[in-house]
Regions:
Chain B
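Phosphate/diphosphate-binding loops
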Residues: 3-5, 11, 18-21, 419-422, ...
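Long, low-complexity segments enriched in small/aliphatic residues
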Residues: 331, 338-346, 364, 496-590
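N-terminal export/assembly segments and adjacent metallocofactor-ligating motifs
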Residues: 1-238, 246-250, 254, 265, ...
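Long, contiguous, secondary-structure-rich segments that constitute the structural scaffold
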Residues: 470-472, 476-529, 589-601, 605-695
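A glycine-rich, hydrophobic/aromatic-adjacent loop/helix-cap motif
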Residues: 284-386, 528-531, 541-548
Length: 217, 695
């Protein structure tokens, strides 16, 4: 079937998502919770697009295309929702995300400036018990990518989403750290994390390692 | 995209045979981080604890950075000229006095295809002997032998993608989540998504927990199990007669042979309940598309090469071959086990396994290199050690292999190394083997060289340097070319691409391979002159004379070692996730803090009988040696069996393994060693033969 993304017509297979169609058409759609290695999740609401005939924007990563659809990645409402979402996410972080992170990239692409809302920010909480993997819990935005990478790419089932609302975060095992969980140190969580909430000590060494200084022990 | 790195290079992992494509990130001249390449065909954006994290070894302070030559009882630093001068002097003297066959070389399954091809050319053209072998001798040589004999070619018939396309997969003697973690993860995901998995292994492996059925056979009884499965497939009418008639030969003899292998009879031999054998045969036989995968639990036996032929039988009689999802997928151990053998680092074959006894092929190499070559095969690794002890082999050039740790019967190997007049080791670290060397040449790791590895899918992939070799160390190819030139045979290669061009020119099945064409996503051989590669083998014909695959009617025969009153337990050895083979690399990384030492897995029933608790030290004694290590009491291992790995030099597991080896390929029988296990604290503690327990 055929769909049009920002006036670019693309031929797609049944079941193709709007995000896949947009990427096939060479159009940029910002995403935070999406990773092509895992099943679409639809949690972050950053990949919103406008669809002709639809009143409200749709999450492109979880919505399948139908024939003849006209999709707009630059839909004004969609962009406004995405930008505000990223702005809210940033407002909870104690510091700006590192430049190389996907979150920083998306914020740049959406031109999110200093957050307008000044609410509570996460307190730094680091875990440096594992020889390679480091937690910086205050950077967790609960996108669920690490948990899904652990389940759907590796199959170690070591990570779990914890807490509710502002206290949502991620933990290894029964809050026992990577080494005492079923973690097999494949690194898929660090690889997919869009904020460095899970990263490697070796990489933190390159920018100074806060996790090593402020571990819980 | 902004980055923290000075440079990122896409290359291919140098650990196991999966062939993950990696991005190696460089800061200040060294590799500081590795992440998965999203377009890697085998890893699809994933890595494991070895490929991703265990790269610190490359920056280790004890890397060899300059040549070393023996002086008195130790070594001293030397220039490249002096080191190579010593080699040429010794080799020329030995050649003059004893002939070229008094010298032997080992290429490395860790090296690139180009390194291995150059190494065999060095031995054949510069030294003048076919005494060249590589470490696939001690792991998958039985696979290579059997697949060539049954199907025609030495390689997997398909790709890892087949696990996702299959309905059923049978894993025999392989533990992918530990030994081949990225494929292990792919199989686990496939199982979660509906692939019906049958695991057959003396240990209950992690994937057994995700499978339909686990078949814990007694070590060394694989042949009985496979003939039993064939029996049920035939008895219950699951044979694909159209396929058998059109594309195979020898079915009737096999059918006749397996008649005796009733599930009850097989239960008697293997210990697997007859009902489970029936169920496994039906799962496999009734699948639309089924794969079989195996590892060293099949090959490292007295009849390993025969069991691989029995695996081929099962696939052939059900027509489960040559389609997506229907494949035979041996999981090759090292990064380049496939390629080192493909590229002629074997005593009996040229590239693409063409025999040295074939006059036309050998003539073509004589012509290409301007030398005279014999038509008789050279020595295999075990034959080399025997010849050294016996006195007819005088010198060895060992590149990238720690035979004194990894080969069986360590005491015999060390005696062989000590018997040599001259030993060259080319490696990145001092090893147990290099302690016996006369000259040690400092080489390069996979992060520092250019070339290709061939993974377990027959896929050649580019290795691209992300850092420079340390100090005055050189790439393996440079060193081999220098030594060859000093011996009077200038190979004339300017780059590793030149080596591959020569391979393509000399090898019809590899005719279209070049570094340019390999590109980012690789080529699966055979590769036609126009560059078309072959993801699935045998879609039209089998690569044997007449184009038919061959059934092999082979009975079960007992393994070379058996438990008795003195040695009542069977030791099985294998890999652990955190470490890699001799541990030369992984023990120099933080992986050591993830797994600092080895243990002996003992079933609770045996532990109680022996009187040992978890964590307590035990002595393990076999007919040839003795080691000590702590016990791990676990139900993963069946009663009557014990398990340990071979990653730690302080344990030296291979002191226990004897000389028993595969009947066709002399691959050692690492998987069946009768042992006795005693608590070191037990009252009847036996005095230790001290010379065998070297720390």
């Amino acid at each position: 079937m055929k769909v049009t993304v920002d006036a670019v017509e693309v031929e797609v297979e049944e079941g193709t998502t709007m995000l896949e169609a947009a990427r096939a058409a060479g159009r940029y759609v910002p995403t935070l919770c999406f990773d092509e290695r895992m099943a679409p999740f639809g949690a972050c609401r950053v990949c919103m697009v406008g669809v002709e005939g639809n009143d409200a924007p749709l999450a492109s990563c979880t919505t399948p295309c139908s024939d003849g659809q006209q999709i707009h990645t630059d839909d004004e409402t969609a962009r406004r929702i995405a930008t505000a979402t990223v702005e809210l996410v940033l407002s909870e972080l104690p510091a700006e995300p590192e430049e190389h992170t996907e979150l920083a990239e998306v914020a740049r692409a959406l031109e999110v400036g200093e957050p307008r809302w000044q609410g509570v920010q996460h307190e730094p909480k680091h875990d440096a018990r594992h020889p390679y993997l480091a937690f910086q819990h205050e950077l967790c935005i609960s996108c669920g990518r690490c948990v899904r990478a652990c389940d759907e790419v590796q199959g170690a089932f070591a990570l779990t989403a914890t807490g509710r609302g502002f206290h949502s975060n991620v933990t290894a095992g029964l809050d026992s750290g990577f080494t005492d969980s079923t973690c097999v140190t494949c690194g898929a969580c660090a690889d997919t994390c869009p904020t460095d909430a899970i990263t490697e000590h070796l990489l933190l060494d390159l920018v100074g390692d806060p996790a090593k200084d402020g571990g819980p022990q | 995209m902004s980055t923290r790195f000075d440079q990122s290079t896409t290359t291919t992992c140098g650990y196991c045979g999966v062939g993950c494509r990696l991005e190696a990130h460089r800061v200040d001249g060294s590799v500081r981080s590795i992440s998965p390449a999203m377009d890697g065909p085998a890893n699809k954006g994933h890595t494991c604890v070895k490929g991703r994290f265990a790269h610190q070894f490359a920056r280790s302070r004890d890397r060899l950075t300059a040549p070393l030559v023996r002086e008195n009882d130790g070594f001293r630093l030397a220039s490249w000229d002096e080191a190579i001068g010593r080699i040429t002097e010794a080799f020329n003297k030995i050649k003059a006095e004893h002939g070229p066959d008094a010298i032997a070389g080992l290429a490395s399954s860790r090296g690139t295809n180009e390194d291995c091809y150059a190494m065999q050319r060095l031995m054949r053209a510069a030294v003048g002997t076919h005494n060249i072998d590589n470490c696939s001798r001690v792991c998958h040589s039985p696979t290579s032998f059997a697949m060539r004999s049954s199907l025609g070619l030495s390689g997997a018939t398909g790709s890892f993608d087949d696990f996702e396309a299959a309905d059923v997969a049978l894993l025999v003697g392989v533990n992918p989540t530990q030994g081949h973690p990225v494929v292990g993860a792919r199989i686990k995901q496939a199982a979660i998504n509906g692939l019906k998995l049958i695991t057959a292994d003396p240990r209950r492996i992690e994937l057994s927990d995700y499978g339909e059925l686990h078949l814990p056979m007694r070590p060394g009884t694989n042949a009985a199990l496979l003939n039993g499965l064939a029996h049920v497939v035939i008895r219950d009418g699951m044979v694909d007669s159209a396929f058998v008639d059109a594309r195979t030969e020898g079915f009737d003899a096999t059918a006749e042979l397996v008649e005796a292998y009733t599930p009850d009879a097989v239960e008697g031999i293997t210990g697997i309940p007859a009902a489970d054998i029936e169920r496994a045969a039906h799962l496999y036989g009734e699948a639309e598309n089924a794969c079989i995968s195996w590892g060293l639990g099949v090959t490292e036996h007295l009849y390993g090469s025969e069991v691989v032929q029995l695996i081929c039988n099962l696939a052939l009689m059900t027509g489960n071959i040559a389609r997506p999802g229907a494949a035979l997928l041996p999981l090759r151990g090292q990064n380049n086990v496939q390629g080192s053998s493909d590229h002629a680092a074997l005593p009996d074959t040229w590239t693409d396994y063409r025999p040295v006894t074939d006059d036309a092929v050998t003539s073509s190499f004589e012509e290409r290199w301007g030398v005279k070559l014999k038509r008789e095969r050279g020595m295999t690794i075990p034959e080399m050690f025997d010849a050294a002890v016996e006195g007819s082999l005088k010198a060895m050039y060992i590149f990238g292999e720690d035979v004194a740790q990894t080969d069986p019967d360590t005491a015999h190997v060390e005696k062989a190394l000590d018997s040599l007049d001259f030993l060259v080791c080319q490696d990145i670290f001092d090893t147990e083997t290099s302690k016996h060397a006369d000259v040690i040449l400092p080489a390069s790791s996979f992060l520092e060289k250019t070339g290709t590895f061939t993974n377990a899918e027959r896929r050649l992939q580019m290795v691209t340097p992300a850092a420079d070799p340390p100090g005055s160390a050189k790439t393996d190819l440079e060193i081999i070319c220098m030594v060859s030139k000093a011996l009077g045979h200038d190979m004339g290669y300017e780059s590793s691409a030149d080596v591959m061009d020569e391979v393509a020119e000399m090898t019809p099945r590899y005719a279209g391979i070049s570094h340019d064409r390999i590109g980012r996503t690789g080529l699966q051989w055979p590769v036609a002159k126009d560059g078309t590669d072959t993801p699935i083998l045998y879609t039209e014909r089998f690569e044997r004379e007449g184009g038919l695959a061959r059934f092999a009617a082979l009975p079960y025969k007992p393994p070379g070692d058996a438990a008795d009153d003195e040695f009542p337990l069977i030791l099985v050895t294998g890999r652990r996730l955190e470490h890699y083979n001799a541990g030369t690399m992984t023990r120099r990384t933080e992986n050591l803090s993830l797994l600092p030492s080895d243990t002996l897995e003992v079933n609770p029933v045996d532990a109680e009988r022996i009187g040992v608790k978890a964590g307590e030290e035990v002595t393990v004694r076999s007919r040839v040696g003795e080691i000590r290590l702590p016990a791990d009491v676990t139900e993963r291992i069946e009663p009557g069996h014990v398990f340990t790995a071979f990653h730690f030099p302080e344990v030296r597991t291979n002191l226990l393994v004897g000389q028993s080896a595969d009947v066709n390929t002399s691959c050692p029988e690492y998987k069946v060693v009768a042992v006795s296990v005693e608590s070191v604290r037990s009252p009847g503690e036996r005095p230790q033969p001290a010379e065998l327990v070297t720390a």
